[in-house]
């Protein structure tokens, strides 16, 4: 008699995970050196879903902007590090990389901050 194969059915379904990351661009937008709408368009054009640029997976990834905060929501695996990479790329493209840096201020968000230049070091150099 031939061996009988058992059919295994998986009853557990994966829950849809909703990843939500925010980028806080408040300081540069208020100072007028950066445009939040332009940055939102940059992210829309550059985010890759399934290896394709610009399609955002047919609504799987969404980008929303409220004043100077940009929120990226995703139903598929999406890396926070990838968002940082794209932000740095945008800053470099617009020659802002020398003044701004991307800092994680919580587990789900980044903030654009100015580099802190020490006044004390400059004063010491002037005295010499």
UniProtKB/Swiss-Prot annotation:
It comes from the Eukaryota. Signal peptide: none annotated. One of its GO terms (biological process) is cytoplasmic translation. GO terms for cellular component: cytoplasm; ribonucleoprotein complex; ribosome. The keyword Transit peptide does not apply. It is found in: Cytoplasm. Keywords: Cytoplasm, Ribonucleoprotein, Ribosomal protein. Component of the large ribosomal subunit. Belongs to the eukaryotic ribosomal protein eL22 family. This is Large ribosomal subunit protein eL22. It comes from Xenopus laevis.
